[in-house]
């Protein structure tokens, strides 16, 4: 295309002298002597300045441009398209606009090329919108919002920080009668903590093991006036406050029952008087056998072990029966206890006497009242309305009005308008409860917002 255009002031033979120099020029101004464009340098410098506003990496772009222009200005300036495209990719919309604006301002010496150059340069205008065409070329693609991760669980379904003994203790202490069946303990845990609504067989086995192997829990048989299936479980009356200040996160120490055998006999004898009488006769017979060798000692001598407690005598007598006569012969002589001492020992082994008018579990009901003001106490897990019912010992069945777990754990939830902040006053954030599966029941959270989450004291 350029060969058909005769440029004034130059002969065709003069073009061969300009190709002795390398094609990669150091700057755009070197094109002035090769192409005979008087005003080209000015406009190229202006376009370079325009590109410099869009990108600081202009030197590589100008060398790309000069190499394509020095290659002989391919037909309709199409050779400039790749270089200009590269500059548009580096410089953004400002650089492409500067290149596109170069077409109408070409030198008058290239006036026959004006229309074609303007058309070719105008064809670069779509590259100015390259950032909006594909997100790969612009910053918009890097800052787009990521899709929410589906594998993140809500904090309301996280595992509670309580041990199984803590869960059982909380369930028993909130009950009106201070005793629950195994199924009622299961139901209480599932109602309060959504985590335990799955994998029920695993944690229910752990609950049964905790009830069986901890001395702080006692099994109470059903009385005739309470028909049903399964025995009741209650707290040991001597267990006291196992948890520090009512906080169920950690126990102070493991409770050990020193009178476990006697209390088991007392619990077994609560149903029938005949069983109690048989146990008294058995204990007296064991005490008599243990004191049998002592009858051969002189009346004036006193055994050094005469101050031993009846429980120790009971254990010693049981060991003597297991080991046979050699153990009884090797045991030190002991004086025969009087009938009054035998009655006291039997009463000590059998526990407190039972009144026929009282239910058998009346003596097992713990009467400990502690000020549980800890954030992880049962009073903070339950609402004030339920505490009012329990303070007056209402025995009629009613639906428990419990606080949601995310309020006690201070997790506002993903839809909450106040993420990461702890509400020290009355709770007004109800959007965090929408993630809970219990939110469908409108009466369930009645009374929840009447008390603060954490106590200020």
UniProtKB/Swiss-Prot annotation:
Residue ranges of DNA binding: 159-252
Q: Which UniProt keywords apply?
A: Activator, Chromatin regulator, Cytoplasm, Developmental protein, DNA-binding, Nucleus, Phosphoprotein, Transcription, Transcription regulation
Coiled coil feature spans: none
Mind telling me which PROSITE patterns this protein's record contains?
Answer: FORK_HEAD_1 (PS00657), FORK_HEAD_2 (PS00658), FORK_HEAD_3 (PS50039)
Spell out the Gene3D superfamilies in the cross-references.
Answer: Winged helix-like DNA-binding domain superfamily/Winged helix DNA-binding domain (1.10.10.10)
Self-association state and partner proteins as the record states:
Binds DNA as a monomer. Binds TLE1. Interacts with FOXA1 and FOXA3. Interacts with PRKDC. Interacts with AKT1. Interacts with TET1; this interaction may recruit TET1 to specific genomic loci to mediate their demethylation.
Q: What is this protein called?
A: Hepatocyte nuclear factor 3-beta
Q: Which organism is it from?
A: Homo sapiens (Human)
């Amino acid at each position: 295309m350029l060969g058909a255009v005769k440029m004034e002031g130059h002969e065709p033979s003069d073009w061969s002298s300009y190709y002795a120099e390398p094609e990669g020029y150091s700057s755009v101004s070197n094109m002035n002597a090769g192409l005979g464009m008087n005003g080209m340098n000015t406009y190229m410098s202006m376009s370079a300045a325009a590109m410099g506003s869009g990108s600081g990496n202009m030197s590589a772009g100008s060398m790309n441009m000069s190499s394509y222009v020095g290659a002989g200005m391919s037909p309709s300036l199409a050779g400039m398209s790749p270089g200009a495209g590269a500059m548009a990719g580096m410089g953004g919309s400002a650089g492409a606009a500067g290149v596109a604006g170069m077409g109408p301002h070409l030198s008058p010496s290239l006036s026959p090329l004006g229309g074609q150059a303007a058309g070719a340069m105008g064809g670069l205008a779509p590259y100015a919108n390259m950032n909006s065409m594909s997100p790969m070329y612009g910053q918009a693609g890097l800052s787009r919002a990521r899709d929410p991760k589906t594998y993140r669980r809500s904090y309301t379904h996280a595992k509670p920080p309580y041990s199984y003994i803590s869960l059982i203790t909380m369930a028993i202490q909130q009950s009106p009668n201070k005793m629950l069946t195994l199924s009622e303990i299961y139901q209480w845990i599932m109602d309060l903590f959504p985590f335990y609504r799955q994998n029920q067989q695993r944690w229910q086995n752990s609950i049964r093991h905790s009830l069986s192997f901890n001395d702080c829990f006692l099994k109470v048989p059903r009385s005739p006036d309470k028909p049903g299936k399964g025995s009741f479980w209650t707290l040991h009356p001597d267990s006291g406050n196992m948890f520090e200040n009512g906080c169920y996160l950690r126990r102070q120490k493991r409770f050990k029952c020193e009178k476990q055998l006697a209390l088991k006999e007392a619990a077994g004898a609560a149903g029938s008087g005949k069983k109690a009488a048989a146990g008294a006769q058995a204990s007296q017979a064991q005490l008599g056998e243990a004191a049998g060798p002592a009858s051969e000692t002189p009346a004036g001598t006193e055994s050094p072990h005469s101050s031993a407690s009846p429980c120790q005598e009971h254990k010693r007598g049981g060991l003597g029966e297991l080991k046979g006569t050699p153990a009884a012969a090797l045991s030190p002589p002991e004086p025969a206890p009087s009938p009054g001492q035998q009655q006291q020992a039997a009463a000590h082994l059998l526990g407190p006497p039972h009144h026929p008018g009282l239910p058998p579990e009346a003596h097992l009901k713990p009467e400990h009242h502690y000020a549980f003001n800890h954030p992880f106490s049962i009073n903070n897990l339950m609402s004030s309305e339920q505490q009012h019912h329990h303070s007056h010992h209402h025995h009629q069945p009613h639906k428990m009005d419990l606080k949601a777990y995310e309020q006690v754990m201070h997790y506002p939830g993903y839809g909450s308008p106040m993420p990461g902040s702890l509400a020290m006053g009355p709770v007004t954030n109800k959007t965090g409860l929408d993630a809970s599966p219990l939110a469908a029941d409108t009466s369930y959270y009645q009374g929840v917002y009447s008390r603060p989450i954490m106590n200020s004291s």
